[in-house]
Swiss-Prot record:
Assembly and interaction partners: Binds to 14-3-3 protein zeta.
Chief place where the protein resides: nucleus
Gene: Wee1
Chain positions found as Phosphoserine: S52, S78, S85, S123, S127, S139, S150, S165, S269, S306, S311, S642
Name of the protein this chain belongs to: Wee1-like protein kinase
UniProt source species: Mus musculus
GO molecular function: ATP binding; magnesium ion binding; non-membrane spanning protein tyrosine kinase activity; protein kinase activity; protein tyrosine kinase activity
Phylogenetic placement of the source organism: Eukaryota, Metazoa, Chordata, Craniata, Vertebrata
Residues that coordinate or bind Mg(2+) 1: N430, D462
EC numbers, comma separated: 2.7.10.2
Length: 646
């Protein structure tokens, strides 16, 4: 081949002509150098690609070919053999990808010429895919060393040693587009999983310094924003299913409709997924950076009470003008033991909601390491204040008022126990009095509460010791009202401990001496012996109180049984069901009386009719007799005779 034919850029041909080109190839013996000499003699330095391709013989290096390549060559040389499809031609190209057209991809200026495999000479036919050839060292045809790049496969000597060899030194990389056209892999490219992309990002890929700098800045800013936006919440242990509610938050996975190959989007999505699966953090009572809510929203009127937890203030809310009771802790709670009790009270208030015999809860917040709880204001104070005032003036609650107290607090305990909670600190200072003239509505259970005095309403408050019945975390309350089984850490009958404390609360309201905190009298009470009551109570009430402090908690009535006890449901305090039963009985009696009345009326009517008939008969008989007498008289009488006397 002439030097001019190598330097002149060959004309562009379509790759689709390779199939027809392959069928017209004519092989002639001779070396490459002889062919070039003939071309020089003819003066055909501008020969076309077809002439050079038709007249060039095979490369004289067929000895080191593999059996698969030899079989492919034999099929091409057999007479009448034609490739079945263009895909078969590309398969042959892949088998001999170490040389020929496969090697034409790696060169410099002459790398655009496509060598027809099996001939060893360069063809000026331009391949459209040569612009996309890759120079990657990885190839389906692997060679043993850097010198094994010959078209005959691995282990063959390099053809470039021959000065007349037309093969340049190209790496063994197949055409990129041609390899894709083989469709060896039918499935589409599978996107990387989230974990694999995260590993790729963590391993550190090669990136531009400027782009990575801005990317890190953006991602760090995004993470700081997400951290600020992620709320920290407490988990209420008194909700029906706190574990399920918490786990459902973990399952809020954000589904994407497509996968983005961008590393920024991928890392951002991974971080969002981690934020959603992050467990909720517990908020501690710390100083707030905002303005004091207590002084901003409320106007303090007076201090109405104090206790172990803190002080209670009577306040007016500036917005609505209503009066509330604000409970503020005495000392800072952050990190102290009382913090758990404060949070437990907030949890219990939030779960219990609104009930006529439970102090209503509105809100709670932390301010300057103090807990503040906004509750309903009870204008009658606590029962302990009323007992102290009665003890000072030597006045006690009457038996009717004691029954009223038992029934109302019992209904409050029934509601708390129905929520699978126990109060564990029932005592006079935790029962509040609300005096109102508004008639009470029908309770949730359907019981009519109109019989209750419309002047006094007893409510249960201070829920700092509330715990669950199923998984108790008991914090012992006042020892004066503590049941013995709780002291012995027997938590199998916790609702009955509230009944025990309620009985002693009623005893204190009845005028008994202050209860002992320990000692022999304390044990006597736990053995079922009532303290001395200065007033005389009925036998039924005394027996009910004695049963409520029975040493065996199973013998004590439950809150449900207590509110339906016959002692508390007197003639004026009967339930709607009992009133309905009595009404039905009275209706039955009335129906019987009506039947008797009808019978009496019928009998009287019959008697009157008989009497009238008898009277008529007597009148008819007397008339007949009178007529007969006149006729007789007429017969007996002589005819009148007129006399004329002169």
């Amino acid at each position: 081949m002439s030097f001019l034919s190598r330097q002149q850029p060959p004309p562009t041909r379509r790759v689709g002509a390779a199939y027809s080109l392959r069928q017209k190839l004519i092989f002639s013996p001779g070396s490459d150098c002889e062919e070039e000499e003939e071309e020089e003699e003819e003066g055909s330095g501008h020969s076309t690609g077809e002439d050079s391709a038709f007249q060039e013989p095979d490369s004289p290096l067929p000895s080191a070919r593999s059996p698969a390549e030899a079989e492919a060559e034999r099929r091409r040389r057999s007479p009448g053999a034609e490739p079945s499809s263009p895909g078969e031609l590309e398969d042959d190209l892949l088998l001999q990808g170490g040389g020929g057209g496969a090697q034409a991809a790696g060169g410099g200026a002459e790398g655009d010429s496509w060598e027809e495999e099996g001939f060893g000479s360069s063809s000026p036919v331009k391949s459209p895919s040569t612009a996309y050839f890759l120079s990657s060292p990885f190839s389906p045809v692997r060679c043993g060393g850097p010198g094994d790049a010959s078209p005959q496969g691995c282990g063959a000597p390099r053809a470039m040693d021959d000065p007349c060899s037309p093969q340049p030194d190209y790496p063994s990389t197949p055409p990129h587009k041609t390899f894709r056209k083989l469709r060896l892999f039918d499935t589409p490219h599978t996107p990387k999983s989230l974990l694999s992309k995260a590993r790729v990002i963590d391993s550190g890929s090669v990136k531009l310094r400027g782009s990575s700098l801005f990317m890190d800045t953006e991602k760090s800013g995004k993470r700081e924003f997400d951290t600020r936006q992620t709320p920290q919440v407490n988990i209420n242990p008194f909700t029906p299913d706190p574990v399920l509610l918490h786990s459902s938050g973990r399952c809020r996975g954000r589904k994407r409709a497509y996968f983005n190959d961008s590393s920024e989007d991928m890392e951002a999505s991974d971080y969002e997924f981690e934020d959603e699966t992050r467990p909720a953090k517990r908020i501690t009572i710390t100083e707030s950076n905002m303005k004091s809510r207590y002084t901003t929203e409320f106007h303090e009127l007076e201090k109405i009470g104090s206790g172990e937890f803190g002080s209670v203030f009577k306040c007016v809310k500036r917005l609505d003008g209503c009066i509330y009771a604000i409970k503020r802790s005495k000392k800072p709670l952050a990190g102290s033991v009382d913090e758990q009790n404060a949070l437990r009270e907030v949890y219990a208030h939030a779960v219990l909601g609104q009930h006529p015999h439970v102090v209503r809860y509105f809100s709670a917040w932390a301010e300057d390491d103090h807990m503040l709880i906004q509750n309903e204001y009870c204008n009658g104070g606590s029962l302990a204040d009323a007992i102290s005032e009665n003890y000072r003036v030597m006045s006690y609650l009457t038996e009717v008022e004691l029954k009223d107290l038992l029934l109302q607090v019992g209904r409050g305990l029934r509601y708390i126990h129905s929520m699978s909670l126990v109060h564990m600190d029932i005592k006079p200072s935790n029962i509040f009095i609300s005096r109102t003239s508004i008639p009470n509505a029908v309770s949730e259970e359907g019981d009519e509460d109109d019989w209750i005095s419309n002047k006094v309403m007893f409510k249960i408050g201070d829920l700092g010791h509330v715990t669950r019945i199923s998984s108790p975390q008991v914090e012992e309350g006042d020892s004066r009202f503590l049941a013995n089984e709780v002291l012995q850490e027997n938590y199998s009958h916790l609702p009955k401990a509230d009944i025990f404390a309620l009985a002693l609360t009623v005893v204190c309201a009845a005028g008994a001496e202050p209860l002992p905190r320990n000692g022999e009298q304390w044990h006597e009470i736990r053995q079922g012996r009532l303290p001395r009551i200065p007033q005389v109570l009925s036998q039924e009430v005394t027996e009910l109180l004695r049963v409520m402090i029975h040493p065996d908690p199973e013998r004590r009535p439950s809150a449900m049984e207590l509110v339906k006890h016959s002692v508390l449901l007197s003639a004026s305090r009967k339930s709607a069901e009992q009133l309905r039963i009595e009404l039905n009985a009275e209706k039955f009696k009335n129906s019987l009386l009506q039947k008797e009345l009808k019978k009496a009326q019928m009998a009287a009517k019959v008697a009157a009719e008989e009497r009238a008939l008898f009277t008529d008969r007597m009148a008819t008989r007397s008339t007949t007799q009178s007529n007969r007498t006149s006729r007789l008289i007429g017969k007996k009488m002589n005819r009148s005779v007129s006399l004329t006397i002169y």
